[in-house]
């Protein structure tokens, strides 16, 4: 009996060791596995505006901290949002209180800081841009509308709606309805990770942010000439660069097929807290409706080359240390 108990104990100890350590490293990674991004357009716009307005103050409060505070206060339910709550928090910071003290009793403040930080890091910051009058440096909105300036479009907010092609699944993106050939620009600077055909998204591009937390997915691009000229996987793009053109490709196993009824850009945003999440059954895609509404005020002006019929951005734009 003693021998049996000894064997059982040894087996359990070995199993526990296998769970906790692999090559001396902790395998129980502590990273976020679920995010529901319910920040409203008004809340995001107010937070961005306050961030910019207070940037030069001694007690600057960034938009992510403000939204994380409200997320913890509301339990993530931004239908409860009141501008006065945001102003109250910003005023307390301005008057000398610390974020640590104001959030010490908020159990989930750190969670919302990480979640909203992953979703929004870099949306505002230092930038340098060319204009018709020269070059200017400032602090402000650094992300761009995915549709180039002067091209008409409308948004169709159906995140989570049912899609049935291939299999029944939720729609994990935001659709921007526009004419075929409308220039698509990078919302945020990053590296092109994927370019090519996908039976669902058609011709598509995937761009990863510099901090690796955000994977932007642009799908249903134009038939025959979907991508910006000479763009390839591994290239770095700047926010506002032309990366492709609106189309209606996809919903087909046959490459270069127009399987979508109405031309539009499918814009998706995946949050990545651990690389194991990137292509898995546990991917985190968030609703970018509020984000696209806020960044539409920052559209990239483009020019057309009449010989190649390609569009490129008119004015150079540099974010931070790009």
Predicted regions span which residues?
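Acidic, glycine-rich catalytic/binding loops that coordinate metals and/or anionic ligands
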Residues: 257-322
């Amino acid at each position: 009996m003693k021998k049996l108990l000894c064997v059982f104990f040894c087996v359990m100890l070995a199993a526990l060791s296998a769970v906790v350590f692999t090559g001396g490293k902790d395998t129980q990674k502590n990273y976020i596995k679920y995010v529901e991004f319910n920040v409203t357009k008004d809340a995001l716009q107010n937070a961005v505006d306050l961030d910019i307005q207070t940037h030069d103050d001694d007690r600057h409060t960034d938009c992510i901290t403000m939204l994380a505070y409200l997320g913890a206060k509301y339990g993530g339910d931004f239908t409860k949002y009141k501008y006065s709550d945001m102003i109250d928090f910003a005023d307390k910071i301005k008057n000398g209180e610390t974020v640590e003290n104001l959030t010490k009793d908020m159990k989930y403040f750190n969670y919302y800081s990480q979640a909203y930080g992953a979703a929004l890091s870099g949306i505002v910051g230092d930038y340098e841009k060319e204009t018709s009058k020269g070059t200017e440096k400032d602090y402000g909105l650094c992300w761009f509308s995915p549709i180039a300036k002067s091209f008409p479009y409308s948004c169709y907010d159906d995140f989570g709606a049912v899609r049935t092609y291939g299999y029944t699944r939720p729609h994990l993106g935001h659709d921007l309805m526009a004419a075929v050939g409308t220039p698509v620009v990078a919302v945020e600077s990053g590296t092109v990770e994927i370019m090519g055909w996908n039976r669902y998204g058609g011709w598509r591009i995937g761009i990863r942010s510099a901090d690796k937390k955000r994977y932007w997915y642009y799908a249903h691009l134009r038939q025959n000439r979907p991508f910006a000229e000479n763009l390839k996987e591994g290239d770095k793009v700047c926010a506002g660069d032309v990366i492709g053109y609106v189309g209606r490709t996809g919903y087909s196993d046959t490459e270069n097929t127009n399987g979508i009824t109405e031309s539009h850009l499918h814009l998706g945003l995946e949050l990545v807290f651990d690389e194991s999440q990137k292509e898995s059954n546990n991917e985190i895609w968030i609703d970018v409706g509020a984000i696209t509404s806020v960044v539409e005020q920052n559209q990239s002006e483009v020019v057309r080359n009449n010989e190649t019929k390609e569009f490129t951005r008119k004015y150079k734009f540099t974010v931070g240390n790009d």
